């Protein structure tokens, strides 16, 4: 092995999945990858399954916490810093890559204190607290969306690392002429109950002759009741609690209705898919709206705020694009033009460049 690399990412799939893509690229180049995470994040399941050694530190977020938690915070942060220092001194990595989550704060500071080159990557159009704090001390600041960070010599717009099998060329789907449009509804692995309620009612108002074929990921707890909602309004739909093969789902779809998480937006561009985006209204710093605007500005998506979009409005917008397939084709072309197929390699290149000094 050429040396150790330490990846820091935790909490949600939006941080962990891009980090796993980078881990595979590091391994392909002959580096041993170790992972720094927290005991409560999704990394505890995904990282061991990927065959990577996982090192845990005790740290949690501060936003929205009560006074008691805020009083304890300095001690907790100091403890997590010493834990991260211990891991880095043990591994002696050639570089540390942080992709977000609470773990990256103490981990990034520990890298700096140990003189290990630090690279950070921000998946969203609005930088998270940890990445904003680490940007001044990082050797490279990678961003998925342009201008997330202030302009500097160390800023690099890379896109989001996305699994290679999600990239589809313009000829991967059957032409829209003479067939129904395929509509994919995604609410994340847990499902988005507002979408589960809105879509059946809206699709019932779409004229039958243009109504799309529907595949709806409703979440494990909501699949049964969502299927019943479709049956109640006499709309045929394939409702699933979870979709494990997203590459196949994207290849099937012609249009997606979904939230606007960073990874979802990047996957839409990789697959060349137009989207109606309903950002999570309570996301930190409203970052999902900013993510969605990236697609909307280019004509690849439409923004539908949850609070102001009812069934009639959604039905009208759906009917418009369903009656004009050329609109969907144009949106798909715009989405594909935004894809960054080299994102993973670019991030890893940046890490190894600073590692070499």
Swiss-Prot record:
Record pathway:
Cell wall biogenesis; peptidoglycan biosynthesis
Q: Which reaction does it catalyse?
A: di-trans,octa-cis-undecaprenyl diphospho-N-acetyl-alpha-D-muramoyl-L-alanyl-D-glutamyl-meso-2,6-diaminopimeloyl-D-alanyl-D-alanine + UDP-N-acetyl-alpha-D-glucosamine = di-trans,octa-cis-undecaprenyl diphospho-[N-acetyl-alpha-D-glucosaminyl-(1->4)]-N-acetyl-alpha-D-muramoyl-L-alanyl-D-glutamyl-meso-2,6-diaminopimeloyl-D-alanyl-D-alanine + UDP + H(+)
Q: Record's Gene Ontology CC terms? A: plasma membrane
Annotated binding of UDP-N-acetyl-alpha-D-glucosamine, by residue: 12-14, 124, 163, 189, 243, 262-267, 288
Localisation: Cell inner membrane
One family name in Pfam for this protein: Glyco_tran_28_C
- How does the UniProt record describe the way this protein sits in the membrane? Peripheral membrane protein
Regarding protein family, the annotation reads: Belongs to the glycosyltransferase 28 family. MurG subfamily.
| GO MF terms, alphabetically ordered | UDP-N-acetyl-D-glucosamine:N-acetylmuramoyl-L-alanyl-D-glutamyl-meso-2,6-diaminopimelyl-D-alanyl-D-alanine-diphosphoundecaprenol 4-beta-N-acetylglucosaminlytransferase activity; undecaprenyldiphospho-muramoylpentapeptide beta-N-acetylglucosaminyltransferase activity
Keywords from UniProt, A to Z, are: Cell cycle, Cell division, Cell inner membrane, Cell membrane, Cell shape, Cell wall biogenesis/degradation, Glycosyltransferase, Membrane, Peptidoglycan synthesis, Transferase
Q: What is this protein called?
A: UDP-N-acetylglucosamine--N-acetylmuramyl-(pentapeptide) pyrophosphoryl-undecaprenol N-acetylglucosamine transferase
Please tell me whether the keyword Cell membrane is annotated for this protein.
Answer: yes
EC no. given is 2.4.1.227
Q: Does the keyword Phosphoprotein apply?
A: no
Quote the SUPFAM superfamilies the UniProt record gives: UDP-Glycosyltransferase/glycogen phosphorylase (SSF53756)
Function of the molecule: Cell wall formation. Catalyzes the transfer of a GlcNAc subunit on undecaprenyl-pyrophosphoryl-MurNAc-pentapeptide (lipid intermediate I) to form undecaprenyl-pyrophosphoryl-MurNAc-(pentapeptide)GlcNAc (lipid intermediate II).
Question: Matching HAMAP family, A to Z?
Answer: MurG
Q: Name where it mostly resides.
A: membrane
Q: Name one GO biological process term.
A: cell division
């Amino acid at each position: 092995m050429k040396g150790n690399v330490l990846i820091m990412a935790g909490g949600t799939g939006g941080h962990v999945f891009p980090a796993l893509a980078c881990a595979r690229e590091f391994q392909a180049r002959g580096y041993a990858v170790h992972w720094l995470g927290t005991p409560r994040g999704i990394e505890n399941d995904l990282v061991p399954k990927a065959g990577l050694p996982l090192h845990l530190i005790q740290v949690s977020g501060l936003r929205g916490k009560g006074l008691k938690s805020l009083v304890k915070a300095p001690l907790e942060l100091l403890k997590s810093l010493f834990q991260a220092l211990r891991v880095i001194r043990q591994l002696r990595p050639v570089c540390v890559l942080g992709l977000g989550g609470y773990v990256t704060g103490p981990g990034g500071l520990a890298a700096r204190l140990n003189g290990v080159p630090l690279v950070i990557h921000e998946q969203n159009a609005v930088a998270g607290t940890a990445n904003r704090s680490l940007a001044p001390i990082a050797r490279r600041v990678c961003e998925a969306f342009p201008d997330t960070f202030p302009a500097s010599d160390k800023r690099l717009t890379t896109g989001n690392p996305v699994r290679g099998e999600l990239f589809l060329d313009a000829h991967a789907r059957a032409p829209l002429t003479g067939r129904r449009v395929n509509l994919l509804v995604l609410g994340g692995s847990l499902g988005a109950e507002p979408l589960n309620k809105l879509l059946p009612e809206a699709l019932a108002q779409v004229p039958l002759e243009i109504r799309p074929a529907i595949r709806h990921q409703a979440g494990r707890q909501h699949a049964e009741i969502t299927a019943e909602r479709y049956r109640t309004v006499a709309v045929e739909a394939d409702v699933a609690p979870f979709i494990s093969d997203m590459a196949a789902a994207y290849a099937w779809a012609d249009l997606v209705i979904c939230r606007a998480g960073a990874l979802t937006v990047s996957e839409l561009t990789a697959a060349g898919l137009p989207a109606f985006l309903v950002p999570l209204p309570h996301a930190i710093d409203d970052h999902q709206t900013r993510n969605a605007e990236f697609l909307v500005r280019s004509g690849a998506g439409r923004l539908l705020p949850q609070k102001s979009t009812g069934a009639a409005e959604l039905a009208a917008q759906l009917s418009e694009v369903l009656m004009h397939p050329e609109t969907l084709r144009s949106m798909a072309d715009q989405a594909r033009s935004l894809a960054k197929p080299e994102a993973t390699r670019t991030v890893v290149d940046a890490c190894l460049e600073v590692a070499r000094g």
